């Protein structure tokens, strides 16, 4: 009795809510064996035939390829695609693909050479001798993807299962009307399918392996039972025919009684599902060493004269397959890729066959019926009763039309499997699946944009944080350098302070002039020569400055007066005039004032900075030079004394010179002269006294 209950519990199946029973229409194509189709002259192989990114190209235009040669490299979810036959790559360009929008995707276009030569194939007949990782990598690199319609990379799916998979389910339900590709494959290749299932079981190591098949496929059931007669590791479960029992979540619930949670995956409850076509492709990749280059495609509908299932090479144009099946198009003929409920209408027939293409339906006008006008929703809830995912299609319809994305997401629109059961039962002929597809696409686009914005924000915040860290580190370095200067900086500071103190000491040192001594004026002379050179350079740089000198220059007048006096004295000496009186001190003072005025005016004209105060030692040197010149002039002109100079006349000339100097300073807008230095006055007085004494002595000598 216990064994009886165990057997009953072991073979128990469950049911799911909703579902419909549309006309099956499978007998048109499942009665004839699989057949080969002649090679097309040209193949179009899209680089993306799966869920995920397209692979990296590894061929170029003009390359010759063999059947099974990789056209792209697969990394991660980037599944590679392979050449369906031997030939030459004539173009790599966008081409319309198998998609409801008929968007153009990058494709490799190959002209077949008709030889259909394979690459060198290396099969692993003893696959158990290889590791799990090696088997998964081989399956991935040979381009195996889910052939049931989703197109998810099989290697990635097996890798993600890991050790948490307890049940492996092989989906053989094929519940949609018209499609018989899996049915015919199980009838003709049951042994190869079972071998592929065992390879998958070897990789996953589940506790049980279940094959779910609907009871409307008696021939396929018989073939599988014959192959599994002596097998105890694989169980065959026959389930009632009901659409959409072939859905992943629905078949999982039927065979295990477990429901996949909202937003979750079947692996969350320890279940992994593969299609029978995928199991066959796994066997060919591992045991035979053949990448996936072809698949079974159902050609059916009343518009074709020879319906059936064919081995179609990937990249073959749809037009080529339909013509081989005797396609007789009508005026408004449509061609559907997929089934009547989940398929989509092709915009033209140059679309290529891809890995997820399982059926090409060419119905007649009578078969499809007259087009129905879309009407308003009457809230009958028939769609909710038929929904196998326990959703509320009528609410999702309103949310989709109103662009209420948040509410549509809250009502689990992502769980919609787009089976079309709701649209099938809708009395208002509302294409609900089209609304749901568009809404899900918009939600995905919004999420993608939000993800990109979040990534951009993260990058910006990371950059700001990095800049703040660099700024803080820079300030810390500057602060540390200011608090603790380097040794060489301290030495430089000490040297600068020493120079400043030395200059201050020199400035405060009094000037002492000893009678009869000759001071060392070499430094002063060198500085004066440097200033003269600087003044000459400035005059050369500003040649126009000389032209601005007014005609009544006091210094010029003084020079002319001095020249005139010298000429007069020379004339008197030649004529034998009276002896020259002693040099008047006031005249010497006048000459010194004139010299200072000339220096200030020269500095104003050249735009230089104000002159430094006159050094007493400099005045002494100039006086000594003047005396030497006077003595030399007297020696040259003879011993006769010159006519004495009138003191009042010299005073008047000095006053006139001072008045002209002050007037010139006012006209030029210069700053007032600095007050006379007491030391300078003392020096000038001493010089005058010395000159007077010397003149008196000279006069006495002349009289003697």
Curated annotation (Swiss-Prot):
It is a peripheral membrane protein. One of its GO terms (biological process) is electron transport chain. It comes from the Bacteria. [4Fe-4S] cluster 1 binds at residues 377, 380, 383, 426. Binds 2 [4Fe-4S] clusters per subunit. One of its GO terms (cellular component) is plasma membrane. Keywords: 4Fe-4S, Cell inner membrane, Cell membrane, Electron transport, Iron, Iron-sulfur, Membrane, Metal-binding, Repeat, Translocase, Transport. Residues 556-565 have a biased composition (Low complexity). Residues 535-684 are annotated as: Disordered. GO terms for molecular function: 4 iron, 4 sulfur cluster binding; electron transfer activity; metal ion binding. Its EC number is 7.-.-.-. Pfam families: Complex1_51K, Fer4_7, RnfC_N, SLBB. [4Fe-4S] cluster 2 binds at residues 387, 416, 419, 422. NCBIfam families: PRK05035.1, rnfC. PANTHER family: ION-TRANSLOCATING OXIDOREDUCTASE COMPLEX SUBUNIT C (PTHR43034:SF2). Belongs to the 4Fe4S bacterial-type ferredoxin family. RnfC subfamily. The complex is composed of six subunits: RsxA, RsxB, RsxC, RsxD, RsxE and RsxG. This is Ion-translocating oxidoreductase complex subunit C. It comes from Salmonella paratyphi C (strain RKS4594).
């Amino acid at each position: 009795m216990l064994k009886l209950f165990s057997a009953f519990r072991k073979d128990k199946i469950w049911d799911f809510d909703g579902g419909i029973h549309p006309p099956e229409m499978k007998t048109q194509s499942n009665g004839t064996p699989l057949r080969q189709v002649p090679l097309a002259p040209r193949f179009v192989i899209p680089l993306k035939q799966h869920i995920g990114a397209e692979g990296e190209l590894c061929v170029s235009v003009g390359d010759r390829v063999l059947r099974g040669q990789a056209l792209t490299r697969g990394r991660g979810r980037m599944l590679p695609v392979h050449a369906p036959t031997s030939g030459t790559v004539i173009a790599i360009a966008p081409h319309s693909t198998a998609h409801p929008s008929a968007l153009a995707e990058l494709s490799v276009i190959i002209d077949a050479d008709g030889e259909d030569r394979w690459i060198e194939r290396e099969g692993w007949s003893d696959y158990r001798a290889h590791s799990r990782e090696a088997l998964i990598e081989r399956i991935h690199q040979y381009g195996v993807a889910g052939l049931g319609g989703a197109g998810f990379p099989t290697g990635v799916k097996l890798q993600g299962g890991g050790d948490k998979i307890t049940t492996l389910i092989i989906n053989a339900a094929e519940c949609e009307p018209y499609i018989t590709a899996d049915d015919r494959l199980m009838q003709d290749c049951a042994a190869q399918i079972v071998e592929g299932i065992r390879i998958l079981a070897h990789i996953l190591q589940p506790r049980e392996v279940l094959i779910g098949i609907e009871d409307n496929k008696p021939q396929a059931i018989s073939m599988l039972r014959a192959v599994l007669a002596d097998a105890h590791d694989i169980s065959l479960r026959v389930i009632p025919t009901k659409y959409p029992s072939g859905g992943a979540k629905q078949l999982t619930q039927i065979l295990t009684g477990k429901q996949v949670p909202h937003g979750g995956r079947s692996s969350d409850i320890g279940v992994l599902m593969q299609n029978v076509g995928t199991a066959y492709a796994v066997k060919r990749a591992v045991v035979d060493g053949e990448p996936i280059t072809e698949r079974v495609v159902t050609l059916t509908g009343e518009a074709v004269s020879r319906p059936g299932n064919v081995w179609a090479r990937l990249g073959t144009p749809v037009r080529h397959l339909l013509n081989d099946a005797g396609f007789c198009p009508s005026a408004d003929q449509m061609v559907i890729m997929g089934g009547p409920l989940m398929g989509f209408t092709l915009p033209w027939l140059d679309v290529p066959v891809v890995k997820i293409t399982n059926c090409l339906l060419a119905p007649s006008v009578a078969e499809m019926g007259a087009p129905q006008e879309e009407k308003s929703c009457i809230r009958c809830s028939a769609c909710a009763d038929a929904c196998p995912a326990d959703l509320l299609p009528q609410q999702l319809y309103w949310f989709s039309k109103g662009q209420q994305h948040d509410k549509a997401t809250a009502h689990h629109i992502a769980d919609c499997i787009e089976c079309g059961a709701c649209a099938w039962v809708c009395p208002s002929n509302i294409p609900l699946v089209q609304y749901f597809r568009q809404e899900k696409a918009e939600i995905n686009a919004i999420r993608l944009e939000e993800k990109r914005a979040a990534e951009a924000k993260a990058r910006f915040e990371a950059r700001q944080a990095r800049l703040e860290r660099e700024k803080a580190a820079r300030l810390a370095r500057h602060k540390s350098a200011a608090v603790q200067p380097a040794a060489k900086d301290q030495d430089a500071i000490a040297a600068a302070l020493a120079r400043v103190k030395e200059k201050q000491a020199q400035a405060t040192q009094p000037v002492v002039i000893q009678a009869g001594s000759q001071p060392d004026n070499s430094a002063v002379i060198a500085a004066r020569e440097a200033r003269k050179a600087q003044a000459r350079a400035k005059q050369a740089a500003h040649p126009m400055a000389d032209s601005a000198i007014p005609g009544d220059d006091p210094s010029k007048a003084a020079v002319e007066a001095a020249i005139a006096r010298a000429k007069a004295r020379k004339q008197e000496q030649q004529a034998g005039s009276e002896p020259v009186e002693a040099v008047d001190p006031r005249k010497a003072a006048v000459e010194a004032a004139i010299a200072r005025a000339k220096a200030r005016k020269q500095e104003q004209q050249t735009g230089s900075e104000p002159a430094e105060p006159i050094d007493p030692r400099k005045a002494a040197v100039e006086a000594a030079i003047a005396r030497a010149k006077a003595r030399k002039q007297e020696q040259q002109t003879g011993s006769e004394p010159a006519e004495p100079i009138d003191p009042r006349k010299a005073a008047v000339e000095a006053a006139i010179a001072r008045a002209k100097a002050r007037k010139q300073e006012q006209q030029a807008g210069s700053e007032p002269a600095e007050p006379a230095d007491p030391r300078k006055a003392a020096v000038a007085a001493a010089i005058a006294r010395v000159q007077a004494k010397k003149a008196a002595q000279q006069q006495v000598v002349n009289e003697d």
